[in-house]
Amino acid sequence: MKDSPQVTVLRLGHRPGRDERMTTHVGLTARALGADKVVLANAARNQADTVIDITDRFGGPFDVASTEEPKRLIRDFEGRVVHLTMYGEPVQEVEADVREANTAEPLLVVVGAEKVPFEVYEHADWNVGVTNQPHSEVASLAVFLDRLFEGRELDREWENPDRVVVPQETGKRVVDPDEE
């Protein structure tokens, strides 16, 4: 988000045939809730295209990249690393420290898909759990980003959209930005 060092979300792993929607939703959630970039495993090319298409239609800025070496990205990242895992420290106990670190350094938020290698736990500055119960990695990412940005992401202004959603009490309304 503006006024702070970059926040990048890394989708660690992607199981074709099993993770299509979940990987897409990790990217869309990262975009909608304040991250600056998502990095997906190369096997997730279609999911990357979907996130790029949404960004083109509904505004940005938001970057999408892919990697064949996600563990190397974690190891070589120049900033702090947060790994979202149900086994981590409770988000409410570490969020202030993570937020403070992100005032000075970029942040890489790692979201797993398949079994996460132990070295990811070791390289993370924080292993963070949202409830320490099994649930969706998309839910964990959403809660974590909301805690990180303290709700500021909900008021974000999107640049250069082709379409704008007009909030309604009932019904749906999507318009050209000039009609808003």
Swiss-Prot record:
InterPro entries: Alpha/beta_knot_MTases (IPR029028), tRNA_m1G_MTases_N (IPR029026), tRNA_mtfrase_aTrm56 (IPR002845). It is an enzyme of class 2 (transferase). Pfam families: Trm56 (PF01994). Keywords: Cytoplasm, Methyltransferase, S-adenosyl-L-methionine, Transferase, tRNA processing. The keyword Glycoprotein does not apply. It comes from the Archaea. Its EC number is 2.1.1.206. S-adenosyl-L-methionine binds at L84, G112, A113, E114, K115, V116. GO terms for biological process: tRNA nucleoside ribose methylation. Its main location: cytoplasm. It catalyses: cytidine(56) in tRNA + S-adenosyl-L-methionine = 2'-O-methylcytidine(56) in tRNA + S-adenosyl-L-homocysteine + H(+). One of its GO terms (molecular function) is tRNA (cytidine(56)-2'-O)-methyltransferase activity. It is found in: Cytoplasm. GO terms for cellular component: cytoplasm. Belongs to the aTrm56 family. PANTHER family: TRNA (CYTIDINE(56)-2'-O)-METHYLTRANSFERASE. Specifically catalyzes the AdoMet-dependent 2'-O-ribose methylation of cytidine at position 56 in tRNAs. Homodimer. NCBIfam families: PRK03958.1. This is tRNA (cytidine(56)-2'-O)-methyltransferase.
